[in-house]
Regions:
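Short, glycine-/small- and polar/acidic-enriched structural segments
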Residues: 26-170, 175-179, 193, 197-203, ...
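Secondary-structure end/capping motifs
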Residues: 241-317
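Conserved C-terminal helix/tail region of periplasmic/extracytoplasmic solute-binding proteins
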Residues: 310-337
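Bacterial N-terminal signal peptides that target proteins for export
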Residues: 1-11
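Pocket-lining segment of extracytoplasmic ligand-binding domains
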Residues: 166, 171, 178, 183-274
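Soluble non-cytosolic domains of exported or imported proteins
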Residues: 71-75, 90, 147, 151-155, ...
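Hydrophobic helical h-region of N-terminal Sec-dependent signal peptides
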Residues: 10-18
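Sec/Tat signal peptide C-region and signal peptidase I cleavage site
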Residues: 19-25
Length: 337
């Protein structure tokens, strides 16, 4: 290769890198992660009905490939995102905020929220008959949740503990927490053969646990924190900037999934039953979806509460000024909080 050709190729490469995102080809494969449970129902609907593929094709992106890896726990999801194994992720709001604060200011790693995903009530269930309130948990109790310290369940527990014992003791029950995916926590709690005797979880697991006469509910997150958004979807700033049409297609697919759930609760229940890793009946899922605390919306509602709490106890070093600082401009027209 002569010097002139090398110079020409170098110039072309530099020009390609300098092109705005809209001028580059967008990805032809997107990896979207989801976890277990009702909170991920919109993503489950999107997967079964191939909504991302349809909206991407309508946007002129052709036939894209969509894969749906399963992850549970904020730390695991964030590690996968940072390693380049994911493009878009459904995650508990605190896990997203943790990575947002950690990566802010680093152009290669910065992340932002694409949309809110879901809200429901997390129930703290226990098999210890002596445990009636948070104050009754002792050193021999073990509380299962998908991830310790920064997962949705972990931070919600800390927020509830701070309300009960004072902000200075927000992590008082952290030594009792054990990292277990929700399906495993359900099995452990009902079997009674494991060290785990409590679980802070979401539907369907929280409902199914109460079918056992050994299990009782200690507390509901809604009673303490209100009915705020629990899960969101996010991606890296780089992915969003380089794939604007795909991001818009994803959001359109998410809104269509939300509309389907609202319009056809029975059909949505069938979708969930087919996808569930635990045995649950259609009627049971219908009951969960009928709960007024269970909502699916792209509007983030109360997400800033997590950030304010996490900043106050110094688990994040950067505090967002508003919810719009956490989320990309595509949803700034919404009445979020």
């Amino acid at each position: 290769m002569n010097r002139r050709m090398r110079s020409t190729l170098a110039a072309l490469a530099a020009a390609a890198l300098a092109l705005p995102a809209a001028g580059r080809a967008e990805v032809q494969e997107v990896r979207i992660s989801r976890g277990h449970g009702i909170l991920y129902l919109p993503l489950i609907v999107m997967q079964e009905q191939r909504l991302v593929e349809r909206h991407a094709k309508a946007a002129g992106l052709g036939d894209i490939k969509v894969s749906w890896p399963m992850f549970d726990g904020g730390n695991i999801i964030n590690d996968a995102m940072l390693s380049g194994a994911l493009d878009i992720a459904g995650i508990g709001a605190p896990g997203f905020i943790t990575l947002w604060a950690k990566a802010k200011g680093n152009p290669k790693l910065e992340v932002g929220g694409l949309a809110g995903l879901s809200a429901t009530s997390l129930w703290l269930n226990s098999t210890n008959p002596a445990v009636k309130t948070l104050r009754d948990f002792g050193p021999r109790d073990r509380i299962a949740m998908p991830g310790i310290k920064t997962s949705l369940s972990a931070v919600v527990l800390q927020m509830m503990v701070a309300r009960e014992f004072g902000a200075a003791q927000y992590d008082k029950l952290d030594p009792l927490t054990v990292g277990l995916p929700h399906p495993d926590a359900l099995t452990a709690l009902i079997s009674g053969n494991a060290e785990v005797n409590a679980h802070l979880g979401s539907p369907p697991f929280s409902y199914l646990e109460l079918d056992s006469p050994r299990v009782h509910r200690v507390l509901s997150s809604v009673d303490v924190l209100g009915n705020i958004t629990l899960d969101v979807v996010y991606c890296t700033r780089r992915f969003r900037d380089e794939n604007p049409r795909l991001v818009r297609a994803f959001l359109a697919a998410l809104e269509e999934a939300d509309a389907f759930i609202a319009r056809d609760r029975s059909g949505a229940a069938d979708v969930f039953v087919r996808s569930s890793k635990v045995k649950v009946s259609r009627d049971e899922v219908m009951k969960m979806l009928a709960d007024p605390d269970t909502r699916f919306s792209i509007t983030p509602d109360g997400v800033l509460k997590y950030a304010e709490f996490m900043s106050s106890v110094k688990t994040i070093k950067v505090k967002p000024a508003s919810w719009k600082e956490l989320f990309f401009p595509e949803i700034h027209h919404l009445s979020g909080s």
